[in-house]
Regions:
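Hydrophobic faces of well-ordered beta-strands that scaffold small-molecule active sites
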Residues: 1-8, 40-42, 65-71, 96-100, ...
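N-terminal beta1-alpha1-beta2 module of alpha/beta enzyme domains
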Residues: 1-66, 164-165
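Active-site mouth loops of central-metabolism enzymes
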Residues: 3-23, 70-74, 161-172, 223, ...
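Catalytic domains of carbohydrate-active enzymes, especially glycoside hydrolases
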Residues: 24-43, 179-187, 324-331
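Acidic (Asp/Glu)-rich catalytic clusters
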Residues: 30-34, 55-64, 85-96, 181-182, ...
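Active-site-adjacent beta->alpha loops and helix N-cap segments on the catalytic face
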Residues: 48-55, 193-207, 343-344
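Alpha-helix-loop-beta-strand connector modules within alpha/beta enzyme cores
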Residues: 51-72, 124-128, 210, 347-359
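An alpha-helical appendage that flanks or caps ligand/catalytic pockets
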Residues: 112, 118-159, 197-324
């Protein structure tokens, strides 16, 4: 199992930072290496620091960590992305991976003038991925596409380590599954609860001919006692009026995974409210108050401060739930919103997952 942390936020509405961003970034990278994790996700958002500058700092501050750099095709052409990977490999003697994203925030797409529809953005991503993969392999690119055209272009210089770069494709829609089949080394999704994820994502993916690796983006809050994990999770991701409104807006997002998570998050909140009302009225004879919360939790997404579901509970409970995905073939776990002092507890949950999955 390959585990990836995520770069720290440069700014937050929730937290006041006592250290400058560069210090926090370097400490996060060092903590990931100590934990034995494979890499660190570097997101692409208009409100975050440029991902390529971040990747360079991580290369300078770590020895083995591999940045997983999010790339939105509208932000730079594939030959530039390949050249950036070549520069990174020349400086630090190791590859980096690419997380190809179509864009999940409708507001950012509008602000940058990206007017392509959902499926068109994935058509562009397919062309992008095919060109990028060819350049990383050292092939000459000669193509006339709808979005990209090249005449006898080859990446030079090209460090041999670029052959180890992987393309991750994020998404869960039929359009993204088609692109994953054609260009992805690893397909990544923000998973639903395991039975639904298997039925609505994994089976269609495999039926469509995908033969690559699997990844999931998920957060973890784990403690020795499940009750302590829930206290931490609810303090860290408090529900607010603004968060609920943002979640409602996401129910009509163009992004399939964001839209589905939002719909599920609203349903989860409604079910919890109904259970609380039932307990107050005495209809459940106290049973509702004694029921353990589900390990799979969308409250962090609903708060507006996380983009993925979370697994919350004891190390064993979180490990058991994560193991369901591992047994299905997931080999890459991209963590969402892990705090620097969470690494030890996350490591224990990951170890429990490996044991439960028999890996």
């Amino acid at each position: 199992m390959h585990v990836y942390s995520v770069t720290p936020e440069s700014a937050s509405r929730q937290r006041e930072f006592t250290q400058d961003y560069l210090t926090r970034l370097r400490e996060t990278g060092a903590a990931c290496e100590r934990a034995g994790w494979s890499g660190i996700l570097v997101p692409h958002n208009l409100h975050e620091v440029d991902p390529w500058l971040i990747a360079g700092q991580l290369g300078a501050a770590t020895d083995t960590l591999v940045p997983l750099v999010a790339v939105q095709p509208s932000s730079l052409p594939p030959h530039t992305a390949a050249a950036m990977a070549a520069a990174y490999a020349t400086l630090y003697g190791r590859p980096l991976h690419f997380n190809l994203v179509a864009g999940a925030r409708d507001d950012e797409l509008r602000r940058t003038g990206d007017r392509l529809g959902h499926d068109e953005r994935y058509e562009r991503m397919r062309e992008y991925g095919l060109v990028l993969r060819a350049l990383l392999r050292g092939e000459e690119v000669d193509t006339e596409g709808r979005f990209y055209s090249y005449r006898g272009f080859r990446l030079e210089p090209r460090p041999e380590v670029l052959s180890q770069c992987k393309l991750f494709v994020a998404g869960s829609s039929p359009a993204s599954i088609g692109v994953a089949r054609d260009v992805a080394d690893v397909v990544v999704t923000h998973p639903a609860r395991y039975p639904e994820w298997e039925e609505t994502f994994l089976k269609p993916l495999l039926a469509g001919g995908y033969t690559g690796e699997l990844g999931i983006r998920i957060g973890i809050v784990a403690r020795s006692a499940g009750e302590d994990a829930w206290v931490t999770a609810r303090e860290r991701f408090p529900e607010t009026w603004q968060g609920r409104q943002e979640t409602l807006l996401k129910t009509v997002s163009q992004s399939a995974w964001s839209r589905q998570l939002a719909v599920d998050a609203v349903a989860e909140a409604a079910a919890a409210a109904a259970a609380a009302a039932s307990a107050e009225s005495g209809e459940s004879a106290g049973a509702a108050g004694e029921k353990e919360p589900d390990v799979y939790w969308l409250g962090a997404f609903r708060s507006g401060h996380a983009s993925a579901p979370f697994l919350v509970g004891s190390h064993q409970d979180v490990g058991s739930r994560l193991a369901e995905y591992l047994r299905a073939g997931v080999g890459h776990v991209l963590l969402n919103g892990s705090y620097e002092y969470d690494h030890e507890d996350i490591g224990r949950a990951l170890l429990a997952a490996r044991r439960a999955a028999g890996s």
